[in-house]
Amino acid sequence: MKSLTLIVLALAGATTAVAANAWRVGQGDVHVICPMTVGGSFDAKTTALSGSVTPSASGSPAFDGSLAVDLRTLDTGIGLRNEHLRENYLEVDKGTGFDTATLSEIDLKGLSPDAPEGKGSFAGLLTVHGVTKTVTGAVDVRRVGAGLRVTASFPVNLPDYSIRKPRYLGVGVKDVVQVEVAFSVTR
C-alpha cells in the first residue's frame, strides 16, 4: 500500500510540475481577413481566444495543449453578414467541432519551446467545421513583463474545411482567408 501511495504522489507531483510549466492565454485578438471576389476585403474579429500549451513531456518539439476560438463570437461589423457567416458557412449551431476553431500540436520552428522568443514559423493542426488539417505560418514571440506576447498569421483555404463558398447577391469571399492572431501568455 505504501508503494501505491508513493506512485500516486509521484504522479501528482509530475502533473503539478507540468501544469506549472503551462503557458496560459490571457488577452487575445483574432482577425480573419476575408478578401472579396469583387475586390476589397472585410475582417471578422473576436477576442474569444482561450487555451494553454505546455512543452511536450515526450521531448517532441510540438506543444501539448491547444488554443481555441469561439466562432459564435466572430463579428464582421454587419449583422446580416454575421448571421450568414455563423449559420450558413461555419454552421456553428451544429455543435462540437463547428462552434470552435482549435489549433493543437503546435510546433515552433526556429524557436525554443522552453523559452521561445524572436521570429520563426509554426505548424499545427487546425480543426474548423469538423475537419482537421495542418496549417503553417509565421510567428513572432516577444517577452513582455513576466509573460510573452505572441503574434501569428496563417492562411486558411475554406474548401479544405468543407466550408461552402460564401456568396450573397453575387458577391463572395475568395477561397483563402488570412488569420492574424495576437495574444499574451503567462505561466
Task: List each model region and its residues.
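Low-complexity, acidic/polar, glycine-enriched regions of mature
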Residues: 19-187
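Bacterial N-terminal signal peptides
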Residues: 5-14
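Hydrophobic membrane-targeting and insertion signals
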Residues: 3-5, 18-21
